[in-house]
Structure formats: C-alpha cells, structure tokens
Amino acid sequence: SVGAGVIYGPSYRGSDDYVFSPIPVVQGNLGGVGISPRAGGIALDFIPDRDGEVSFSAGIAAKLSRNRAAQIKDPVVRSYGELETAIEVGPSAGVSVPALLNPYDSLSFNIDAVWDVAGAHNGMSVNPSITYFTPLSRGIAVSLSVSAKHIDDDFADYYYSVPAGGPLPEFQAEGGFESAGGNLLGVFDLDGDVTNGGLALIALGGYSRMLGDAKRTPFTSIRGDADQWMGAVG
C-alpha cells in the first residue's frame, strides 16, 4: 500500500511552534520482503511470516531526519542556523504475537538501531517500541504504540548543545533517553474491508515527552516545550 498525508507537529524536536508537513506512507510486501512505516522512513523485513503464528522480523531501517533543517518558526532558534539533513540506517528486529484477545489482533515488539551515514550528526539512536493492533470491524482497525528513543553523545551534541556567544545560555548536551511517548492510529477502509489493500483513510494522534538533555537544552526549556503533540491524516 502506498499513500500520502499531512502531519501537524512541532517545527523542531522540543519546539512549542507547530507546522504542517507532507508525509508519504508505504506498507506491505514486495517480493517476500515486508515493508513497514517508520517516522521519516521505512523498515524492511527479510523473514517470511506465516499467518496465525508468532512471527519474527529482521532487516534494515532507513530514516530521514530533518530536525532543525527547515521550518524553524522561533526566531531565536533560527538565529543558530539550519542543520544538515541526516540519513539514518541500521538493523531492525522484532517479534509479533497474534490472537491475544481476538483471532485478528496482535502485539508487536520492535527495535531499530540507526546510524547517520550522511555526515550530519554522525551519531546513532536506538528506538524500541511496542504496538497493539486490532480490528474494530471488517472495515475499521486501530493500533496503539508506545516508544522511546535513546541517543548517543554525538547525536545529542549536534541537536541539543548551545554554543556560547548567542542569545541563549551555553549548554553542552550528552546522550541518554531523548523522548518517550505514544501514538494512536485509526484506519477506515473505503470499501469496508481492511484486508484487501484498497483505498483507506487514516488518522493519527500522538504525544511524546522530551527527556534528559533534550528537555534541559535551552532550545526546549526556554524557547520550546517538553510536551510534544502531533496529528496526521491521509
């Protein structure tokens, strides 16, 4: 399945200003390779699954990070300049357990570990997540996800350190947990059958909380907000 939508979210990680951005959505199976969406990218699963059984996934995740690379609405943060776009690639693995509360639901555990290969932040992040999926009817399905993000020192320094000599206090950021939060996704199939891959409408809402130095940086604590909200339709 291929789709497109629009997301309304913070203008940068930790911002209290919100902007609209287009988003592509790709999910399905191509030549035996599973394709799952990720924030800003996709994950490929090279292990075939069997219906009705516990399944394992292993493959590659690839993400595009445009944090503070565009659409910075805050004039003080913008005065520190736009950052480079990061391309993050690394291994992805998970396990999915079906038929917990009904014959069609599932509980999935996934983890991605990705490194910047474009020379932007030159760091890495680890992203664990848990997702519960269930249909509400033949044409409507929902999923609830909780996730966290752990970053290394290079990642933290690039996005959250504040150099001396500017309008904000100097700050040296170090790695740790960057954020944790949850998303609720709803899918409404236009022909009443979510299993046949036809046209569908999606709605997504989410909340995350900035943690550690991502919360303490003046970009968040003075010019932004640790509480981050987002919504998307497509």
Go through each PLM region and give its residues:
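Residues on the lipid-exposed face of transmembrane beta-strands in outer-membrane beta-barrel proteins
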Residues: 4-8, 24-30, 42-48, 60, ...
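Structural signature of outer-membrane beta-barrel domains
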Residues: 9-11, 63-67, 98, 114-118, ...
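Residues that define the transmembrane beta-barrel architecture of outer-membrane proteins
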Residues: 18-24, 52-54, 83-89, 122-126, ...
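Glycine- and aromatic-enriched membrane insertion/assembly motifs of diderm outer-membrane
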Residues: 18-71, 84-112
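Extracellular/periplasm-exposed beta-strand and loop segments of Gram-negative cell-envelope proteins
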Residues: 69, 79-84, 116-120, 153-163, ...
